[in-house]
Amino acid sequence: MTEDIYSLFQKPKNPRDFDAIRIKLASPEKIREWSYGEVKKPETINYRTFKPEPEGLFCAKIFGPIKDWECLCGKYKRMKHKGVICDKCGVEVIQSKVRRERMGHIELAAPVAHIWFVRGVPSKMGLLLDLSVRQLERVIYYEDYIVIDPGDTPLKEKDILTEDEYKKCISQYGNKFKAGMGAEAVRELLKKIDLDIVAQELKEKIEAATSTGIKRKLTKRLKVIEAFKNSGNRPEWMILDIVPVLPPELRPLVPLDGGRFASSDLNDLYRRVINRNNRLKRLMELKAPSVIIRNEKRMLQESVDTLFDNTKRSKALKAGTRRPLKSLSDMIKGKQGRFRQNLLGKRVDYSGRSVIVVGPELDMHQCGLPKSMALELFKPFVFNKLEEKGYATTIKQAKRLVEQERSEVWDALEEVIQEHPVLLNRAPTLHRLGIQAFDPVLVEGKAIKLHPLVCTAFNADFDGDQMAVHVPLSYEAQVEARVLMMSVGNLLSPANGKPIVVPTQDMVLGIYYLTKEKHDAKGAGKVFSDPEEVILAYQCKAVEKHAPIKVKLNGEFVNTTVGRILFREIVPEGVPFQMINKELTKKELGKLIEYIHYNFGKRDTVLFLNKLEKLGFEVATQSGISICIDDMHIPSKKTELIKEAEAQVMEVQRQYAEGLITQGERYNKVIDIWANVTERVADEMMKELGAERGKEFTPEELAERRSFNSIFMMADSGARGSIAQIRQLAGMRGLMAKPSGEIIETPITANFREGLTPLQYFISTHGARKGLADTALKTANAGYLTRRLVDVAQDIFLIEHDCGTKDGIYITALIEGGEIVMPLEERIYGRTLAEDIKDPLTGEIIAKRDTVIDQALAKKIVDSGIDRLKIRSVLTCRTKFGVCSKCYGMDLARSEPVEIGEAIGVIAAQSIGEPGTQLTMRTFHIGGAATKIVEQAVLEAKGSGTVRFKNIHYVERKDGSLVVLNRNAMIVITDSSGREREKYNLVYGAKIIVKEGQIVESGQRLAEWDAYTTPIITEIGGKIALGDMVEGVTFKEETDPTTGLSHKIIIDYPATYRPRVTIKDKDGKTAKLPSGTAARYLLPAGAILVVDKGDIVEPGDILAKIPRETIKTKDITGGLPRVAELFEARRPREAAIVSEIDGIVEFKGSQKGSRVIVVRGADETREYLIPKGKHVIVHDGDWVKAGEPLIDGSINPHSILEILGPTELQRYLVDEIQKVYRLQGVSIHDKHIEVIVRQMMKKVRIEDPGDTSFLIGDEVDRFIFIEENEKVIARGGRPAQARPLLLGITKAALSTESWVSAASFQETTRVLTDAAIEARIDELRGLKENVIMGRIIPAGTGSPVYKDTLIKGEFYSMQIEHFSEESIEEN
């Protein structure tokens, strides 16, 4: 009998038992089905007995008993009465936890509208009824009447009538028509809607509509109608007759001491609903006047609104404490809501946290665990061990032993801990290396010991950081921890494949000191027969570490030092000696570790790292390097350099006073002078670092003394500090920036050793404070960026080996400003070839398609002279719901092909987000010293070769130099075989000093230009005439107050004017340019005229100058917002106008206050209106490519997509994002950015639905679109047409297929409302959905591929089964 009753109750679903989850509107029948009884009274619990009031909000009869297996009145106790319903109090005898899942309901006296569907944007109810939210609300809140059935009156259905109009109609038509107010009236209208007919009508209207605005509006409505039609939801379910009541345990009432109660806000909200509902019932029974009833109904509607969503209402209901009450919606949304607080961020049992201290004596796979902590964490295991060994017979006894901390307990703990890894985590966990597994070693004290080499990965230091420890319990968890998460298995960074376990600080300093050379050290010049002899001599103190010696290695003599031979002892055999026969800085050590890892494997690397750490610390200790004030030597030439600079500044000031230069130019020049002098002082300081007062040294001696200067060694080895910081200590601090980013033109000439004057100190504080303020703000921003990135990419895994696509992307070396910033071999490392590669000279195949490129192959490809490769990429991968292994390439963290199930989306997001946080924390290290990049105004050849010109349009000046007259002009330097070696862009107006075909040496000047102004240059000679120059309208005479000289500056002028400089020929006619157009040069606002009427000019002369903006300092502050802007695909504020076709530029007058630029292509012409005052960067007669900007400004990514297509856009986004990171010296592999870009471009917008079920303007997943089209074509129908879409990451994350994931990200209520109306099914494909549902995530070892893998328990001696609940109860 009891079994049958027990089976009536729903058992909690096992998360593995279902594969998808659907959300839809609840019908009134469904709500009644959920409910265990009606809540009729607003009372909660009896204040004297503390027992719940019957029929109240905590009623035990409805929701279940308060104590396990016990009814309320106490007639039935114990488990034997399971399932009995008490005849006295009506409570069922069952576990009290049913109070967490049993719901009640409230029968409403009048229907109410659900606020989510009324108030959401766009309002769902409004769209269905074709009413505005305003009208709808007036009806629902009983202000206006709505016509339900017009009968045979001239009224129309859904007409809105005010109180007076309604009375008028009643007197006119009597009861021929039907109108009503409130949710009842709305429900009747919703019931009348025939979805099929309305949908058909709308489709016809959309076909007939002419304007896109109307089409869009109708489509919006059609979408909602279709959603209701396809989902099986009825529109009238948006109006509620019955309100479900949450189980009482989820809205608890907790007694505090002192007889007061802490209650969940929901209880107050429910109480108001019940009170008003009961009052309304009573009023209706008493047949109260309609006004009173109407008011009560409105109040009921409002109270239900507040219960469901208190934030959507204009006036949120406040508690007594003036804070808004937390409604049901507030419970689920936001950081403190159900999703993010309880489902995605659970607390974990078997965990502890403590301060970390350094443990240099540990091996790399170990961590020190405090004894007391370990005992607590491994308690169950210790109990088991004590029983096993016979020290205790029951758990209770074992407990007692542990509490007494007897000696056998510690022995048991030692044994338990053997081979049982623990996880260490340091918050914030910015990438997956923030949690790693270690073998615990018991230590005294209360601090966790951490190996110094893993600090980089955790970003930990020992200034009070804390870390958390977690214990993996099951065999499976232990195996995963050991195989996948062990610190020795994570030597490479997933972001770029470089070693992340690189020695830092002291270790670097020690190794660097060990490998230095000192020519007068003891034993210098000695010759040894083998390394053993050297070590013996060193141990006998016959030679010093730094002595340069000769040693016979592999049969030949090598010049080296004693220290390097000592270092050779710890390096694996087989590493070429030349790799370590040099001063080993941090960078060199990184290369060495990478080499060892690549050639000798993980095991040797770890052994080497362990030895390296011990040796580094040892030597650093012996060296006795420290900082002393005399180490900061102030250069003797400093005063004279500063005097010289002051003289130059005076000269610039004089030129300004005479009116030769403008204020802006003066400022820029002064900044430049000081930036240069700071550099020179720094150079002098570096030269003289080793000097002592009153002693003379030869330059050679000085160089050696300098190389042993403590501060120099710290910076040079890469241990701590930089040359820039030494400069501030001993050179001069240099230019500082204001908080706004402008540079203050008086620099700080003092350094920290001399000390600063109060004024200098005050100027310094700007930068220092801004640095600290920025850090705080930007950490939050970077964290938010990471969160958005993870959310957009969390459902991308590796699903299959090969998607079979033939597509790929082309990759070349990245060149910026003539310099290769990223060589080809770095860019192709870890990628898969998309086609066979042939040697350009011999034609033999170097590698077949689908080969993964490792370091050796990358080198081979580059050496063969190939400079452009087609590789496979995630951007072109055809795998649905994921990516294939071939397109992704190598798993950078393990340098082998990536495995199926790898969560590459999350790895990509972490790789991009983690340095964002890092960078933002690093803005203030130079204390705001302005690091202005000295404007490059001279171009020098880097190597030797032959000069070639590439699309240069120029005129020759009298002196034989050439002046460039177009943009995208280039100078190329080729080697003897005609291969391009260097490539330089030239700016408009640059002066070329070399001739085409000339052979140049490295360092030779090629061209120069003015870095501060953009000139306007004449192409022909002649006499100057000015047009439309009206003072005060198109230009103003600016008289410089300091100089008394005047010049003409063009100002923002009315559209009818076109100020210009015209060149006249001998006859006084307007001369013609070689292209045939008239020689007129339009002057933009801000231009400063250099010529005057009647002047005679030669070809190549400057007519006017446009000053460039004054310089601001560059810093990732510009960087992080820039990265966010690119990922969010925002349209830039000052977007450049871009040419849509290839063609020749023509200037054509102006219209409506804008200049008109025409681009003439081969078969089409495009006109562009340029707003006045914008600086045009193309010139008449220039040839522009599609996608090139015509005016200054950032390019709008959406226009790249439209003009150049998706491939170009993808390349642009990847390159632009990489640029920002590269500026900060952060290396991220392209593939990570590609993964995110793939997600941003996964949707298409339907332009023409054809015969498919799509609607115009629908945003559909690319794969679904292709699939649907294939089906339609197979049926012989017309396929849909669509254009690719670029979504920002926030929008892409919200438009994911999974509603659970989207709701837990942002805008929870909107996502849930939309999903419920469509009755969306979540297939639980991504990580987040599965974490929320409490399932194993479908990535890594949880992948469907490994579903049936079992782990054999024999490897582990421990038996965990001992700890099921029953065994504890029995004892």
From Swiss-Prot:
GO MF assignments: DNA binding; DNA-directed RNA polymerase activity; magnesium ion binding; zinc ion binding
A GO biological process this protein is involved in? DNA-templated transcription
Q: Which cofactor does it need?
A: Mg(2+); Zn(2+)
Q: Which residues form the signal peptide?
A: none
Species:
Thermodesulfovibrio yellowstonii (strain ATCC 51303 / DSM 11347 / YP87)
- Supply the name of the protein: DNA-directed RNA polymerase subunit beta'
Query: At which positions is Zn(2+) 1 bound?
Result: 71, 73, 86, 89
Q: Where along the chain is Zn(2+) 2 bound?
A: 803, 877, 884, 887
Amino acids binding Mg(2+): 461, 463, 465
**Entry's cofactor comment:** Binds 1 Mg(2+) ion per subunit.
Against Pfam families, the record matches this protein to: RNA_pol_Rpb1_1, RNA_pol_Rpb1_2, RNA_pol_Rpb1_3, RNA_pol_Rpb1_4, RNA_pol_Rpb1_5
